[in-house]
Amino acid sequence: MNELEFVTKHRRHLHQHPELSLHEFETTAYIKAFLDSLNIKYDCPLETGVIAYLEGNGSHTIAYRADIDALPILEENDVPYRSQSDHVMHACGHDGHTTTLMLFVQRCKDMQDAGQLPQNVVFIFQPAEETGGGANRLIKAGAFDKYPIEAVFGIHVNPFADEGIAVIRDEEITASATEYRFFLTGLSSHVADKEQGHSCGEALQHVLTQISQIQQFHLNGLKRNIVHIGHFKAGEAINTVPSNGYLEGTIRTYDIDDLTIVKNQMHKIAESVKLLFNVDCEVKFAEGYPPTINSPKLRTQIEDALIKADLNVYDKPTPFLFGEDFSFYGQQLAPAYFVFIGTRNEDKGFVTGLHTSYLNFDEKVLINVVNFYENLLNNYKEV
């Protein structure tokens, strides 16, 4: 089959069989079977995900990453390759990322067989990007300890940019993403005896108000930060003083100092609840994703490789507010660079955003990505 047939076949198979973070068992088996067909050795440091390696002629080792997990979304696309999993969908394009890396593996294997693979290559089929921090899990598991990786590259499809556009930016390209949760515990009573209770309802209103003021009064208005409240609840019955409350949301920022400010303010809010309402309040933070930092030292190589792949380069003036665990590779492993590849095609109706039930794209864009990857490999220079 030709390369367009290859990416169409594999992407649509993966699209029909999406799996949630840390549950990508069939996807992992599919990738392993593909690698087995090429006689390529691989490791599985975690229950899901695959790390493959090909030795080249040069002394450098570079890595390419694709995330393989999907989202808990009911697909609404009316296409033959629609998701067959109930309320699970590749709504973030990871089926395309995985397929791209599979084709690149095949190209590299062909080069190796011909004695023409210029450098050593590590292929990262990573689980749990959406939730679970799969990149950090792999690093902590020692998945890359035996590889002297000098640089890590990755891409993400981007339906906000037209086909043929590659969006890049040095330094921060995505925000940090940190989840927070408030837990409130008061004392229940009948509403007729409300003075006997300690209401989590009023306490939760206070928390909501104070969180909404963090961005206005404690963060620099010239910076793009998000302190988002996603879900909250208090009590169970309409005639009872609620004895419990719960609130959760996400923080998006590019600046670690700003994140520290937000966390400190939230701890103060929790303390104030006890003083004002006699309600116990605790705030917890889930391990978040740091900002994705693109190494300026790799910029020239990235731009040249994109242009040679017939992609027009757009230098984004401000970072995206997406969170992305590719950030851990640049933070802990090696200099890294992350590129957004445009997939928007109005004629075909491919216009909806990431994490939506209608996300779709033309598989031909994936071949440009593989060309970009190969150009990077052929012209890699140590930084």
Swiss-Prot record:
In terms of Gene3D superfamilies, this protein maps to: 3.30.70.360, Zn peptidases (3.40.630.10)
Q: Which UniProt keywords apply?
A: Hydrolase
EC numbers on record: 3.-.-.-
Keyword Hydrolase attached = yes
Q: A Gene Ontology molecular-function term?
A: hydrolase activity
Q: Which domain of life is it from?
A: Bacteria
Name one matching Pfam family: M20_dimer
Q: Which InterPro entries match?
A: Amidohydrolase, Bact_exopeptidase_dim_dom, Peptidase_M20, Peptidase_M20_dimer
The family assignment reads:
Belongs to the peptidase M20 family.
- Per its record, how is this protein called by name? Uncharacterized hydrolase SAR1410
Q: Which organism is it from?
A: Staphylococcus aureus (strain MRSA252)
